[in-house]
């Protein structure tokens, strides 16, 4: 039987509201915590994120997940463990659970922020000409990959007009290796009717300098694609704060 929704049912909380809780069981939020939260929210609304250090921005994210406690210790613990706001947001769930007292509610909030950032960056490059949107493409790659703790290999598929038609994760690996199979890359290009590719992978160490293995796999993929009439435009290695282009560096 389909449940009829009543207009008297409680609505979801607005983004700046507290998450509803049962006051009988949770108790009243101490005034000093409530005042602190109001001040942070007011400062965010007035000055935006630029007016706030990482630990305060992280507190704002944690407010909804931890509605009845002081979140400052959690924010500090997360930053002490991972270094900065970006690394906290992109940290793997198992490592986030290593923080004492931090549960799924917090992890979900953090991962929602990460997913939103990636979707916004991706929307700026999909179905766009890669040359005219090159900076946006680099921003997307950094948003999606720069703070990962393991290597990820992505392939950007382009049509004849160099418009990005697909962005796919090919493989995930360890901290310094990711398995890639040139024939599978070329096969997928044919399936998507792609005319060109851009390879992208990250270096968790933060240094985008290509290894010998990086150069070897690039040549192998280029050879596999050439037999099918598919062009390899570039291979980007994403570091923590910069990237390396095989094309610009003379490797292609």
Identify the residue ranges that each predicted region occupies.
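Structure-specific DNA junction-binding interface
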Residues: 1-80, 87-98, 105-119, 123-198, ...
């Amino acid at each position: 039987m389909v449940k009829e929704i009543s207009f008297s049912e409680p609505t979801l909380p607005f983004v700046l509201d507290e998450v509803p809780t049962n006051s009988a069981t949770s108790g009243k939020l101490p005034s000093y915590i409530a005042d602190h939260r109001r001040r942070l929210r007011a400062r965010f609304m007035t000055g935006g994120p630029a007016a706030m250090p990482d630990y305060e921005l992280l507190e704002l994210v944690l407010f909804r997940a931890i509605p009845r406690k002081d979140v400052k210790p959690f924010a500090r613990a997360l930053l002490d463990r991972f270094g900065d706001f970006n690394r906290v947001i992109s940290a793997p769930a198992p490592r986030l659970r290593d923080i004492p007292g931090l549960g799924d509610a917090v992890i979900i909030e953090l991962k929602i922020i990460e997913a939103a950032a990636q979707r916004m960056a991706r929307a700026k490059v999909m179905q766009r000409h890669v040359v005219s949107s090159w900076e946006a493409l680099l921003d997307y790659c950094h948003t999606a990959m720069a703070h990962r703790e393991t290597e990820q290999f992505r392939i950007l598929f382009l049509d004849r007009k160099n418009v990005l038609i697909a962005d796919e994760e090919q493989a995930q690996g360890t901290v310094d290796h990711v398995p890639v199979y040139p024939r599978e890359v070329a096969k997928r290009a044919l399936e998507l009717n792609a005319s060109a590719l851009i390879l992208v992978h990250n270096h968790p160490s933060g240094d985008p300098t290509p290894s010998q293995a990086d150069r070897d796999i690039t040549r192998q993929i280029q050879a596999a694609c050439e037999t099918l009439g598919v062009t390899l435009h570039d291979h980007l290695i994403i570091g923590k704060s910069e990237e390396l282009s095989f094309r610009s560096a003379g490797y292609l």
